[in-house]
A protein has these predicted regions:
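Glycine-rich nucleophile elbow surrounding the catalytic serine of serine-hydrolase chemistry
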Residues: 112-122
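Serine-hydrolase catalytic machinery in alpha/beta-hydrolase-like enzymes
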Residues: 11-103, 199-202, 206
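Conserved alpha/beta-hydrolase "acid-adjacent" motif
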Residues: 169-174
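Catalytic active-site module of serine/aspartate enzymes centered on a nucleophile-bearing elbow/loop
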Residues: 202-231
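Catalytic histidine neighborhood in serine/cysteine hydrolases
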Residues: 182-197
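A conserved short beta-strand
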Residues: 131-145
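Short beta-strand/loop motif that positions the catalytic acidic residue
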Residues: 156, 162-164
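Alpha/beta-hydrolase fold nucleophile elbow
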Residues: 102-114
Length: 231
């Protein structure tokens, strides 16, 4: 792989006794990389996440969509909501990126949906943003930040965008509570008329537009930990 090649390949990440399947797409001379964490009952084949990923790719951002659970694990409802396990699996994917010499130097963002957003927020709290192995930005789509710990929400330094559908009222409340706890640069964006899966006309397009803008802003020039950020 060189800087000027378009790369699209399937990958496997070995974690303990499991193999996680992933789809890697790296445009020529990428601005940065975004790792996707899907929600419960979904997978790397999620049409919604793939739509957002395609918009990121069109704007020069590489993407890795990964299955955080094996097929057998995903059949167990309790495992789907095991945020600690999902976070560990997401961390393994970050480590895979950081060990891949072709993409390891690029700024890294996380895009999480539903329970995957909780894992992304948990993981972001463990990395010092701006460092070589840090997380440069986080975007949550219909996320469940209530499943992340309060300590994690207060610890995150990566700029974080929370996107929620205007008709997803219970999740709006959960995101509003998380927003108050967070001390990083942050934004809560409500998409009018959208439900939890953003299936309404134009809703997913708006999500993609917001995600592209957020990642282009922060992957191109990550905020260093000692820089002043909005509270």
């Amino acid at each position: 792989m060189t800087r000027h090649q378009l790369v699209h390949q399937s990958i496997r990440i070995h974690v303990d006794d499991a193999y996680l399947e992933g789809d890697l797409h790296v445009p020529p001379s990428p601005v940065g990389m975004v790792l996707f964490a899907h929600g419960s009952g979904s997978s790397r084949l999620s049409p919604r996440n793939n739509y957002v990923a395609a918009r990121l790719q069109e704007n020069g951002i590489g993407t890795l969509l990964i299955d955080l659970l094996t097929a057998d694990e995903d059949r167990d409802f309790s495992i789907r909501f095991d945020i600690e396990l999902l976070t560990l699996r997401l961390a393994a994917a970050v480590n895979w990126i950081r060990l891949n010499e072709d993409i390891q130097s690029h700024a890294l963002g996380l895009f999480g949906a539903s329970t995957g957003a909780a894992a992304a927020l948990q993981l972001a709290a463990f990395y010092r943003q701006g460092q070589d192995d840090g997380i440069a930005a986080v975007v949550s789509r219909g996320g469940r930040p209530d499943l992340a710990s309060q300590e994690a929400l207060q610890t995150i330094v990566a700029p974080t965008l929370l996107i929620v559908g205007g008709e997803d009222r219970s999740v709006i409340s959960l995101n509003e509570q998380a927003y108050v706890l967070m001390r990083c640069e942050k934004r809560l964006q409500i998409i009018p008329g959208a439900t939890h899966l953003f299936e309404e006309s134009g809703a997913l397009e708006k999500v993609s537009e917001l995600a592209v803008s957020w990642f282009l802003r922060y992957l191109a020039s990550p905020t260093l930990p000692n820089q002043k950020i909005a509270r």
